[in-house]
Amino acid sequence: DAITEFIDTTKEEGIPVDGFQLSSGYCAIETEEGIKRCVFTWNKKRFKDPKDFFAQMKKRGVCVSPNVKPGILLIHPKLEEMKAKGMFVKASETEEPGIGTWWGGQGMFVDFTSQETRDNWKEMLKENVLNYGTSSVWNDNCEYDSMVDKDCRCSFEGKGGTIGQLKSVMSNIMCQISNEAVHETFDNTRPYVVCRSGHAGIQRYAQTWAGDNLTCWDSLKYNIATILGMGLSGVANQGCDIGGFYGVSPEAELLVRWIQNGIFQPRFSIHSTNIDNTVTEPWMYSNCTEYIRTAIKFRYRLFPYLYSLMERAHETGLPIMEAMCSAFQNDPKCYEEGVDFMFGDSLLVANVVEKGAKTRKVYLPEGNTFYDFYTRTPYNGGQTIELPVDLGSIPLFVKGGAIIPMASNQMKNLMTEQPAGISILCAPDCDGSFTLYEDDGVSMDYEKGCYLKTFVSMTAGERTVLTFKQEGSYATSVETMALDMIHREKAPYWVTVDGKEIPHFLHRRKFEEAECGWYYSQTLKSVQVKYLNPKKDHQVVVSFEQFDLIGM
């Protein structure tokens, strides 16, 4: 009830939510040595009916990821059964299982390098977790570091090996099994697996995060560097425990700044075990809740852009949060930067990460034009600028050539809502391109062609042309299209959609009331275009050509 109440409160506060990562307290049961956390068991006082719990969360549009660990306490009720099946890493000098330190005492550790063990673990996962109604798993504490004797022996597919040699593969295999178990339990369902650790290739099976971080300002900065480094290593689907995991509760300013950075992380999760008996919640400081609400809602507006970047990472391995030295390899000054990053190819993010900051210095890479996301103020690259900031500031810059699709409607839950319209922010200083990706988000149908890729190409010039070409059979939810085209020099002469000139409005209110047309915003120095989504290949032409006033 406390968890469903938390989700309901989040919705009442107007804060979007889609997932809940269920910590291992759900499997804290009464044993001979007191309350202990035993994987694949349920505390029936806290969860009288696990199946109903998952059903209630699904009804609220929330995906639950239960915590699963590979260590088995010596007082675990299933220990002897697992031991008899030979599921554990063996001691270095005997045929008995090796023993190491675990949560709440001594424990044995599952050997995932054995096919028989993998099959048994998969069945236990299905029977004790997935069959209750979740297609998500949170694999945790799978580094095997607490096995002090690194000569403990693993099967290694019958060839033999030591845990010292093989511990790095355990988390990858554990996540692979989790994916297989979901596919075997649910028809046509996309697994969602989260894992704290892994070696090269973990991105094939799981989303990862930067571990149990300390709640402090330094961690905020270090976590950004960690995520950027993981992106350079091919692990794009990454994040951190926002607000800090361990320590006293975050002060208000730190929490706001962490969330403002977290909205750009592929994995956004506020997660804590505060030592002052508090819980980190987005509304814990009432005077800051609006800043937090605004930031998280902005993440949901960016969903079409982020989801497309996720698909790009899936296909190519390219980062979502990209280090400046990677995005601008020919600019030596970008090799000195460890906090700013590119969010995709089009957005430069310069979060405020210093306590009490009143200004923020930002280096803009040379050879590019950048625009303030909010004011559209232009800046030439190759210079450091200094901006005034307050607690609500999230400094963002649009790179010349940018194409950034955003949701026109404000969604608060992606399981129950979809983008009704797409608004594309673009900056035609130069040519640009972007692939907008859509699918149902939950099934495996995308493997059968049930997706929609819209290849958007922009040719800049006196006649700026945006061409939309589609691939795939997915039926989009998008009914309206809008363009927000930065063009400070002058307004257009005319705008066409598929060769047909659309109405020009001189008054903003009349433009807003119309279904189709264009308007030039003097405030933003931007061309605003909107039209019904043709749901097919089409072209938009915006003419900035000189025209004859007498001829008008």
Residue positions per predicted region:
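Short, surface-exposed beta-strand/turn "edge" patches of beta-sheet domains
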Residues: P378-D390, H504-K535
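Acidic/polar residues at beta-strand termini and the immediately following turn/coil
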Residues: D111, D372, D439, E512, ...
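Catalytic-domain carbohydrate-binding cleft regions of carbohydrate-active enzymes
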Residues: D1-S393, K399
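A broad, low-specificity signal marking well-ordered, structured residues that form hydrophobic/aromatic
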Residues: P191, F341, L347, I394, ...
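Solvent-exposed, conformationally flexible loop/turn segments
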Residues: G356, G382-T384, P534-Q539, F544
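Accessory, solvent-exposed terminal regions and/or long lumenal/extracellular loops of proteins
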Residues: V398-K500, R509, S521-T523, V529-K536, ...
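Intrinsically disordered, low-complexity acidic/polar segments
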Residues: I29, L73-I75, I202, K358, ...
